[in-house]
UniProtKB/Swiss-Prot annotation:
One of its GO terms (cellular component) is mitochondrial large ribosomal subunit. Residues 219-255 are annotated as: Disordered. GO terms for biological process: mitochondrial translation. Pfam families: Ribosomal_L2 (PF00181), Ribosomal_L2_C (PF03947). One of its GO terms (molecular function) is rRNA binding. The gene is rpl2. Part of the 50S ribosomal subunit. InterPro entries: NA-bd_OB-fold (IPR012340), Rib_uL2_dom2 (IPR014722), Ribosomal_uL2 (IPR002171), Ribosomal_uL2_bac/org-type (IPR005880), Ribosomal_uL2_C (IPR022669), Ribosomal_uL2_CS (IPR022671), Ribosomal_uL2_dom3 (IPR014726), Ribosomal_uL2_RNA-bd_dom (IPR022666). Belongs to the universal ribosomal protein uL2 family. Keywords: Chloroplast, Plastid, Ribonucleoprotein, Ribosomal protein. PANTHER family: LARGE RIBOSOMAL SUBUNIT PROTEIN UL2M, RIBOSOMAL PROTEIN L2. This is Large ribosomal subunit protein uL2c. It comes from the Eukaryota.
Amino acid sequence: MSIRLYKSYTPGTRNRALSSFTEITKTKPEKSLIQKNHRSKGRNNRGVITIRHRGGGHKRRYRIIDFGRKKHNVEGVVAAIEYDPNRNARIALLHYTDGEKRYILHPNNLNVGDRVVSGMEAELVIGNALPLEKIPLGASVHNIELIPNRGGQIVRAAGTSAKILAKEGDYVTLRLPSKEIRLIRKECFATIGEVSNNDAFLVQSGKAGRTRWLGKRPTVRGSVMNPCDHPHGGGEGRAPIGRTRPLTPWGKPALGIKTRKNKKASDAYILRRRS
């Protein structure tokens, strides 16, 4: 992927940097692999906002992606590389030899016409999926299962990959993109390679309207709200927050406070917390 930089022809193009989409080979999705996507816009069943800054945006159709890669020992050919509005990574359309079609996350350097397969004895080629115990040390993997046969759950974002550090007993040690070092069972499947679109973090919207197209609503500072809306609100003019420390809109300490539960079952498998 490459980034297209814009000149300051208008205020909306000043500082704009968007994807060039040069890797996209097909513009319309496969009809058999899409479904309606009802988005909650950050509201619960009573219409109350539970997640702020969500709403609006262009309608999206969900692409059904094969995170499990459980179609073992059946070869698939990459027919197209497509855009997915629901994620930063690109997706690849596979045509299997038995006639079935599926989407997978598109790894870097996987091109149209390449062949991929998943299974216990799959080759160590980009795009192939196999158990962690079959992958050598130092290899980069993505779309990793946390529990066998549940499907890939971690390392699925654009440009991410995990590195295999060690194997001991029933577990494999991986370094995740967050620098967390974690144990995962050796039977869990993972896909070889790095997720595509590793320049996604360089994208700059350039104008507020384009951010609204993506379904993101404005973030308002607490200091400009009323006291009834935020602990930092109120005062005459630009007043200080008037508290010993910054607080969230719900009155809990913010900035530097750990929010992870201290009695999670997965703590036993985390050798080093993320930095």
